[in-house]
């Protein structure tokens, strides 16, 4: 979904629950992908998961996209394509990092969205309920940044 994630996410979740004959009150925890990935999409998903968990009185569990890819693949380096010919990668013992996509040997790319969501759900179900609330996993700073100059003054006409 290129645009409109915030508007479509709640109806989409409601449709998924209804298709499985599950109500919000039936949930015991909420799993959410925390990235790395699309900056805005990750922020929307994490904020929604935290809000739902708070309102339902259940924990929200954050799962790294790279960990979910690793859980769903037999081999390769978990890899998420990033802008400008780069990729987010993570070796088994290392922290996520940003590298040139062409430098990744044997990349394990995200599977179909449904499979990635299932891997996130499995990892969240197996995780401790006592961890910190999920937060976006940022490997690099956002492209947009606050203005460095002071905000302009608005003058009265009087």
Which residues make up each language-model segment?
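Generic beta-strand or strand-like secondary-structure segments
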Residues: 8, 12, 47-51, 65-68
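Phosphate-handling active-site elements
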Residues: 19-25, 53-63
